[in-house]
């Protein structure tokens, strides 16, 4: 069980409405709010809370079922609850599926229209809004880290375009907003790259992993702390937030995952049983949705505005592997 230790400095009356609490990030944001004594209310599309039943605070906190694509329902729910802040974690995140012709309208309805619905409701009650976005709003070319206030948008795929549309909906509707771009997300409550690698590593003796896509992982437990730090302030704007520890490839990440797993006693991932080979994106084969090569996000604005950076991704991975069963 995680131990939450915070120096409480917030408004005990702050009410925060969190979307997407069945997912990795929404789950952790709710727990962080509880740890700081804030009033957190979660929502997702399921009739009841359907995230990890792990006994943490989120499983017992108030929950409202809401379809964010239903404009009237969003307005009614948010104006009745009157939260001080809405942290919008809900999104369509299946990047390849988003390319299917029969899915595109739904993806846009969730990521763009749903976000507009929430922004409009926030404007009505003068609430702050946090919108979680992605490096996929850029074209992923070059090697220079993307700056949070860069406007050279050029999404490579449907998912990226709809997340950009969501960003613009927030920025064009509100003044009190935090748009936070993240990359390579992992958390306890949901599917992610680490869990996938641990699973395939058990059943294969050789894996090939892409080595020419570069970025940095983001642990939702660490990110949730930063997001709650943010809503305690009025330092609005665009931010980039991943863990520290440098820029790496998916191949580098995989090697470290298995190295740390072995250190924890999982010898099935040792190099004498499991070989991991680097390949280029071209060699790996075409995925339905194009992926950015350059997912480097510059995070210096966080420190400039007085926010505490996230721990290193290596440290985050170490803590994460001790949280999950594999």
Can you describe what each PLM-predicted range is?
Residues 57-70:
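Rossmann-fold cofactor-recognition segment
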Residues 303, 311-326:
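Amphipathic terminal alpha-helices
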Residues 68-110:
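NAD(P)H-binding glycine-rich loop region in Rossmannoid oxidoreductase-like domains
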Residues 105-114, 137-180, 184-185:
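Catalytic helix-loop patch of NAD(P)-dependent Rossmann-fold dehydrogenases
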Residues 188, 213-222, 242-260, 319:
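Substrate-binding strand-loop-helix patch
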């Amino acid at each position: 069980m995680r131990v939450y230790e915070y120096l409480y400095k917030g408004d005990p009356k702050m009410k925060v409405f969190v979307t997407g609490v069945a997912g990795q990030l929404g789950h952790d944001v709710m727990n962080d709010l509880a740890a700081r004594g804030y009033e957190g209310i979660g929502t997702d599309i399921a009739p009841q809370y359907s995230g990890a039943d792990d006994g943490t605070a989120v499983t017992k906190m108030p929950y409202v079922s809401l379809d964010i694509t239903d404009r009237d329902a969003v307005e009614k729910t948010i104006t009745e609850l009157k939260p001080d802040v809405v942290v919008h974690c809900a999104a369509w995140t299946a990047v390849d599926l988003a390319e299917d012709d029969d899915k595109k309208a739904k993806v846009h309805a969730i990521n763009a229209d749903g976000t507009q619905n929430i922004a409009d409701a926030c404007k009505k009650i003068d609430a702050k809004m946090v919108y979680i976005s992605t490096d996929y709003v850029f074209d992923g070319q070059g090697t220079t880290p993307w700056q949070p206030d860069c406007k050279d948008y050029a999404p490579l795929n449907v998912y990226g375009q709809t997340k950009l549309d969501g960003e613009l909906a927030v920025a064009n509707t509100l003044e009190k907003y935090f748009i936070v771009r993240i990359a390579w997300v992992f958390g306890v409550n949901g599917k992610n790259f680490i869990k996938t690698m641990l699973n395939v590593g058990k059943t294969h003796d050789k894996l090939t992993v892409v080595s020419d896509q570069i970025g940095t992982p983001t642990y939702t437990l660490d990110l949730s702390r930063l997001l709650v730090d943010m809503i305690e302030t009025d330092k609005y704007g665009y931010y980039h937030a991943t863990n520290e520890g440098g820029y790496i490839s998916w191949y580098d990440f995989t090697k470290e995952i298995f190295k740390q797993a072995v250190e924890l006693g999982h010898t099935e991932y040792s190099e004498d049983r499991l070989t991991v080979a680097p390949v280029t994106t071209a060699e790996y084969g075409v995925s339905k949705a194009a992926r950015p090569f350059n997912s480097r996000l510059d995070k210096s604005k966080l420190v400039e505005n007085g926010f505490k950076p996230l721990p290193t991704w290596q440290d985050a991975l170490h803590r994460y592997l001790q949280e999950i069963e594999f």
